[in-house]
Regions:
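Glycan-recognition surfaces
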Residues: 202-205, 209-321
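Aromatic- and glycine-enriched glycan-recognition loops and surfaces
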Residues: 1-21, 34-38, 205
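Loop/turn elements at helix/coil->beta-strand transitions in domains of secreted/extracellular proteins
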Residues: 10-17, 47-52, 216-220, 225-230, ...
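Carbohydrate-binding surface patches
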Residues: 137, 309-312, 317-319, 354-395
């Protein structure tokens, strides 16, 4: 089974990854995980999976519609529920009372669609801290899906999904288990979805939480250390995941799929290099797997590709056949100097500090040094120079001012000293990377 496979893969010094989709089917039209997040996350954790890519094929967005709420109730699992009419709440935005004498409360609240309004209960009182059943009572309307977030005490958020309703009865109720504290609690009801990007964020956050809960559960059941799962968000950059990815997972794809085409690798680089401010420790922009050794890429292109991915803190996932790798390709992807730059504990992505035929990238490192990459984007040779002193005043890079800098190129081992300027001569598509101290 997969659990045994994970052990075999780990014994080879590798980690096991798995894949599914934030949709009804995967990109190969196999069963996927939308709506099954907790079950599938628990399965992955039991298997010992260490890396999980969550794709975007056959995706179904969350509804921007909200139900018509007439009351809520709160109860412990073995107690009588305490009901709160909407008249006990404060309405904001476009939320408004609508009369319906057939309802127990005599009215309901509409106007919660697409983050346009919300219901806030400030007086939900319980006797002790713990888990409670929150029931949302609604008036049925429309054979279409609806959605609410229940936000508790300005902190935890709980999703409530409402399927299409049939009108055999006037009302329906839907429940979620929430954490409440002793005394008065604040409960807000709203639908935050105004765009597909909002929908993506909440769905990927749902899976991210499910993975964390699952690894903690398995560790507790087995009485062993927790084995976390790296969560890779793959919605191809459509919903600007760099804005919300850190709240959902560990890395997020910035573009559609990579190919072993030099022009496409450069396009992905151009898009991803601009996103440096969004990366942080444990949260990274993902320009997709490495194509080093694939297609018709030249040696210089392979070196530049690997160098740029290292500078941008990209996950270094090999996309080539590990069983059939040339010594040249192996020497590139196992360059310990470049891998150390990528894995530096400061975890700051390189910033492009000069743009042109030759781009210059600067990546601050934990020991106070700076990695400086010269990247020749052209199909002909080029010369370039760069004044290191310009990095002293750069608040992001923060190079320490010195009268003389020592620099070492990480591919050739070339060493130099300079009072400020580094000059390079580059072949077509070539990159050089210096550690400057």
């Amino acid at each position: 089974g997969i659990a045994n496979l994970a052990k075999q893969v780990n014994a080879m010094g590798l980690k096991l990854g798995a894949y599914t989709s934030n949709g009804t089917l995967t990109c190969e039209d196999l069963p996927a995980s939308l709506g099954r997040e907790q079950y599938d996350a628990y399965t992955l954790a039991k298997w010992g999976v260490e890396y999980f890519k969550y794709d975007y094929c056959h995706h179904i967005p969350i509804s921007r519609y909200a139900p018509l709420v007439y009351s809520i109730s709160v109860s412990q699992f073995d107690s009588h529920p305490m009901e709160y009419s909407v008249h006990n709440a404060v309405l904001s935005g476009l939320a408004r009372f609508m009369t319906d004498t057939k309802l127990p409360s005599g009215s309901y609240v509409s106007g919660l669609d697409a983050n346009q309004g919300r219901i806030t209960y400030n007086n939900v009182e319980v006797d002790e801290d713990g888990k409670y059943v929150l029931t949302v009572n609604i008036k049925k309307k429309g054979a279409y899906e609806k959605y609410l977030i229940a936000k508790i005490n300005d902190d935890e958020e709980y999703e409530i999904l409402f399927p299409p309703q049939k009108h055999y009865n006037l009302t329906a109720r839907f429940q979620v288990i929430v954490n409440l504290k002793t005394g008065k609690n604040k409960i807000e009801l709203f639908n935050p979805v105004t765009s597909n990007a909002d929908s993506e964020m909440y769905q990927y956050r749902r899976m991210g939480k499910a993975l964390k809960d699952a690894t903690a559960r398995v560790a507790k059941e087995r009485k062993q250390a927790e084995k976390p799962i790296v969560f890779s968000i793959c919605e191809w950059g459509w919903g600007k995941p760099y804005n919300w990815g850190a709240k959902a997972g560990n890395l997020w794809r910035t573009t559609p799929d990579i190919r072993p085409w030099w022009i496409w690798i450069k396009i992905i680089y151009e898009h991803t290099v601009k996103l440096y401010k969004y990366a942080s420790k444990g949260h990274y922009n993902d320009p997709d797997m490495l194509e080093v050794g694939n297609g018709k890429l030249t040696y210089n292109q392979n070196v530049s590709h690997f160098s740029l991915w290292c500078m941008m803190n990209a996950p270094l996932i090999l996309g080539n056949d590990l069983r059939n790798m040339s010594e040249q390709v192996k020497s590139i992807v196992t360059n310990r100097n470049m891998i150390a730059i990528n894995q530096d504990p400061l975890a700051k992505q390189a910033k492009r500090v000069k743009k042109g035929v030759v781009d210059v990238l600067a990546k601050p490192l934990a020991d106070g040094s700076v990695a400086v990459c010269f990247f020749n984007k052209s199909s002909h040779g080029a010369k370039a120079k760069f004044d290191l002193n310009s990095l002293v005043d750069d608040k992001y890079v923060g190079l320490q001012k010195k009268t003389e800098y020592a620099a070492k190129e990480q591919w050739s081992g070339e060493k130099l000293t300079t009072s400020g300027t580094i000059s390079v001569s580059l072949e077509k598509c070539q990159s050089k990377v210096y550690i400057v101290k």
